[in-house]
Amino acid sequence: MGRLRDTGYLLFLTMTPFDTFDLNRPVDAVPSPLPVWDPQAIERLVGANQAMQHRLLTRFVVTAADTLAGIEAAHAGADLPELMRLAHSLKSAARSVGAMALGEQCFALESAARAADWAQCQRLAPTLTDLFSKSRSLIEARLQGTA
């Protein structure tokens, strides 16, 4: 045992790889290495058909804005089932057109609403507006032919 102690074995056994207080700290937003918008995602979905891509991207920008307004209303009214339903809907739409960071954040909100974690919903819901705005800017630049 003396040889193990000399090599630091006992120190290793008593160390933790993280501070346990970090486990209880809430997350303000889902850390996301995902891109705000992946322009190849829409092509993987519908192929190289530019007209179809344009139509789906245009529809996403309009319907996502409406869905986001619904999420904001559900959040303001503390309506967890509606928040979950709308977050699920926006998640699917966002991922299909390549708004990956928005889709991931919607997934986190949907999961929090499903778990009835109101505190987490309170932190996540307001972050969607900024992610949608960033995604919309990139998508609209593509639609206008500048990206």
What function would you assign to each model-found segment?
Residues 3-147:
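Two-component system phosphorelay core
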